[in-house]
Amino acid sequence: MSIEGVLEQGFVTTKADQLINYMRTGSMWPMTFGLACCAVEMMQAGASRYDLDRFGIVFRPSPRQSDVMIVAGTLCNKMAPALRKVYDQMAEPRWVISMGSCANGGGYYHYSYSVVRGCDRIVPVDIYVPGCPPTAEALIFGIIQLQKKIRRTNTIAR
C-alpha cells in the first residue's frame, strides 16, 4: 500500500487514494460472461481447489453488483450488443478481463463471418489472459495483474 510513515503514536499515514485502491483490490466482485469453453476454466477457478473467495473475489450474478467483468469465450455478433449492455449496467469504476484467445482476438473462429475479432472492439479491456482455454492459474494471474493495475490508478482524480 506504499505506507508513507509509521509514527510512534500508533497510527499509519498514507494517501486517501492509495487506501481506496487498496480496499478495492481486496473486494473485487466479477460478473461472469461465459460464452464458451473458457467459462469452464473460470468456474474451476471459483471452485474448491483454487477458491477465489479467499482473495475476496466473489462471483456476482448481476452487473449492478459487480465491478469486474470476465469475458470468457467466443463473442458472436449477436452477443455483442448484450455484452455492451451488461458493461453499461456496471457501476463505476469497472474493469474488464478478456479470457482466452477467442475473447482476445477471435481465436480459432477468427475468420468466421459471425465472430467478433476480440471483445475489445465492443468494450474497453484492461487485462488479456491468453490460452485456449487458459488454465485457472492463468486467470488468477490475470486477476492479480488487475489488482496491481488498480493500485496504480489515480482514483480520486478520475
UniProtKB/Swiss-Prot annotation:
<dbReference type="Pfam" id="PF01058">
    <property type="entry name" value="Oxidored_q6"/>
</dbReference>
<dbReference type="GO" id="GO:0045271">
    <property type="term" value="C:respiratory chain complex I"/>
</dbReference>
<protein>
    <recommendedName>
        <fullName>NADH-quinone oxidoreductase subunit B</fullName>
        <ecNumber>7.1.1.-</ecNumber>
    </recommendedName>
</protein>
<keyword id="KW-0874">Quinone</keyword>
<dbReference type="GO" id="GO:0048038">
    <property type="term" value="F:quinone binding"/>
</dbReference>
<dbReference type="GO" id="GO:0009060">
    <property type="term" value="P:aerobic respiration"/>
</dbReference>
<keyword id="KW-0520">NAD</keyword>
<keyword id="KW-0479">Metal-binding</keyword>
<dbReference type="GO" id="GO:0008137">
    <property type="term" value="F:NADH dehydrogenase (ubiquinone) activity"/>
</dbReference>
<dbReference type="InterPro" id="IPR006137">
    <property type="entry name" value="NADH_UbQ_OxRdtase-like_20kDa"/>
</dbReference>
<keyword id="KW-0830">Ubiquinone</keyword>
<keyword id="KW-1278">Translocase</keyword>
<dbReference type="GO" id="GO:0005886">
    <property type="term" value="C:plasma membrane"/>
</dbReference>
<comment type="subunit">
    <text>NDH-1 is composed of 14 different subunits. Subunits NuoB, C, D, E, F, and G constitute the peripheral sector of the complex.</text>
</comment>
<keyword id="KW-0997">Cell inner membrane</keyword>
<feature type="binding site">
    <location>
        <position position="38"/>
    </location>
    <ligand>
        <name>[4Fe-4S] cluster</name>
    </ligand>
</feature>
<keyword id="KW-0813">Transport</keyword>
<comment type="similarity">
    <text>Belongs to the complex I 20 kDa subunit family.</text>
</comment>
<keyword id="KW-0408">Iron</keyword>
<keyword id="KW-0411">Iron-sulfur</keyword>
<dbReference type="GO" id="GO:0050136">
    <property type="term" value="F:NADH:ubiquinone reductase (non-electrogenic) activity"/>
</dbReference>
<keyword id="KW-1003">Cell membrane</keyword>
<dbReference type="InterPro" id="IPR006138">
    <property type="entry name" value="NADH_UQ_OxRdtase_20Kd_su"/>
</dbReference>
<feature type="binding site">
    <location>
        <position position="37"/>
    </location>
    <ligand>
        <name>[4Fe-4S] cluster</name>
    </ligand>
</feature>
<feature type="binding site">
    <location>
        <position position="102"/>
    </location>
    <ligand>
        <name>[4Fe-4S] cluster</name>
    </ligand>
</feature>
<keyword id="KW-0004">4Fe-4S</keyword>
<keyword id="KW-0472">Membrane</keyword>
<dbReference type="GO" id="GO:0015990">
    <property type="term" value="P:electron transport coupled proton transport"/>
</dbReference>
<comment type="function">
    <text>NDH-1 shuttles electrons from NADH, via FMN and iron-sulfur (Fe-S) centers, to quinones in the respiratory chain. The immediate electron acceptor for the enzyme in this species is believed to be ubiquinone. Couples the redox reaction to proton translocation (for every two electrons transferred, four hydrogen ions are translocated across the cytoplasmic membrane), and thus conserves the redox energy in a proton gradient.</text>
</comment>
<dbReference type="GO" id="GO:0051539">
    <property type="term" value="F:4 iron, 4 sulfur cluster binding"/>
</dbReference>
<dbReference type="GO" id="GO:0005506">
    <property type="term" value="F:iron ion binding"/>
</dbReference>
<feature type="binding site">
    <location>
        <position position="132"/>
    </location>
    <ligand>
        <name>[4Fe-4S] cluster</name>
    </ligand>
</feature>
